[in-house]
């Protein structure tokens, strides 16, 4: 009953749609929102403005590349005042890697490959 009342009260809150660009902290995601605007400058062109939001992700369901809907809420921290509502579209690369873990490459493997790919120069006297 109380949840229905809260749904009615918060119905006026608009959702913001964006893409998750960073997930370095627990329960926090950085989302980027692109907005189209008309630039009335010399050439009168349509341009995009991007805004970054730190959003609260209480269940840690976001991943980098996901399209999410989020809304305003009471401030959770100094820079976080938005909360995730739902994930609209999952990142297809993340889903593929989750289903096929054999393709995941660790930073240690990358460093080893770089070391093996280096050209090993020898002095002429060593030949």
UniProtKB/Swiss-Prot annotation:
GO terms for biological process: translation. Gene3D superfamilies: Nucleic acid-binding proteins (2.40.50.140). GO terms for molecular function: rRNA binding; structural constituent of ribosome. Its main location: mitochondrion. It is found in: Mitochondrion. Keywords: Mitochondrion, Ribonucleoprotein, Ribosomal protein, RNA-binding, rRNA-binding, Transit peptide. SUPFAM superfamilies: Nucleic acid-binding proteins. GO terms for cellular component: mitochondrion; ribonucleoprotein complex; ribosome. The keyword Nucleus does not apply. InterPro entries: NA-bd_OB-fold, Ribosomal_uS17. Belongs to the universal ribosomal protein uS17 family. This is Small ribosomal subunit protein uS17m. It comes from Dictyostelium discoideum (Social amoeba). The gene is mrps17.
């Amino acid at each position: 009953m109380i949840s229905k009342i809260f749904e009615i009260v918060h119905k006026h809150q608009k959702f913001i749609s964006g893409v998750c660009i960073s997930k370095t902290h627990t329960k926090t995601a950085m989302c980027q929102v692109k907005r189209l605007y008309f630039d009335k400058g010399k050439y009168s062109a349509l341009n995009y403005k991007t805004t970054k939001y730190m959003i609260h992700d209480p269940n840690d369901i976001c991943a980098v590349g996901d399209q999410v809907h989020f809304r305003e809420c009471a401030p959770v921290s100094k820079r976080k005042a938005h909360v995730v509502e739902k994930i609209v579209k999952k990142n297809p690369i993340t889903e593929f890697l989750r289903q096929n873990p054999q393709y995941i490459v660790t930073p240690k493997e990358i460093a080893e490959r770089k070391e093996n790919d280096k050209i090993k120069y020898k002095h002429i006297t060593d030949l």
